[in-house]
Amino acid sequence: MAENQYYGTGRRKSSAARVFIKPGSGNIVINKRALEEYFGRPTSCMVVKQPLELVDMVEKLDLYITVKGGGISGQAGAIRHGITRALMEYDESLRPALRAAGYVTRDARCVERKKVGLRKARRRPQFSKR
C-alpha cells in the first residue's frame, strides 16, 4: 500500500478491527466489501462514521478495514475505536475532540460469565415454596 497510511487497532466485546487510513475520496472498505454492503443496518454504518463526521473528514480519507470476531454491534464498535486511534496517529490535534465525544476510551463492557448454581449469569432457578 501507500507510504503515507496510518494504522489503528480497535476492540469491542470479542471483536478486533485493524484500520488503515490514507488520504483519498471517502471510500470505506471492510473485509473487501463496501460499508453499506457489509453492515445491512444503518445504525451500524452510522456508528462507524461517527469519528469521521466529528472531525469532518468523511470525504478526505480512504479506509481499509479488516475485522474479526463477535457480532454486528461489537464489530461496529471495534471499527469506530480503530478509526479513532488511526485518526489520532494521523493528526494528534484531533485527540481532544475525539476524547470529549468519548471515542478514545475502549468500552470494557463484555459478557458476564455464567455462575455455578445459576441458569445464566444472574438468572436464578425458579423458586418453589412447596
Curated annotation (Swiss-Prot):
PROSITE patterns: RIBOSOMAL_S9. The keyword Endoplasmic reticulum does not apply. Belongs to the universal ribosomal protein uS9 family. This is Small ribosomal subunit protein uS9. Disulfide bonds: none annotated. GO terms for biological process: translation. The lineage of its organism: Bacteria, Pseudomonadati, Pseudomonadota, Gammaproteobacteria, Vibrionales. The gene is rpsI. InterPro entries: Ribosomal_Su5_D2-typ_SF, Ribosomal_uS9, Ribosomal_uS9_bac/plastid, Ribosomal_uS9_CS, Ribsml_uS5_D2-typ_fold_subgr. Pfam families: Ribosomal_S9.
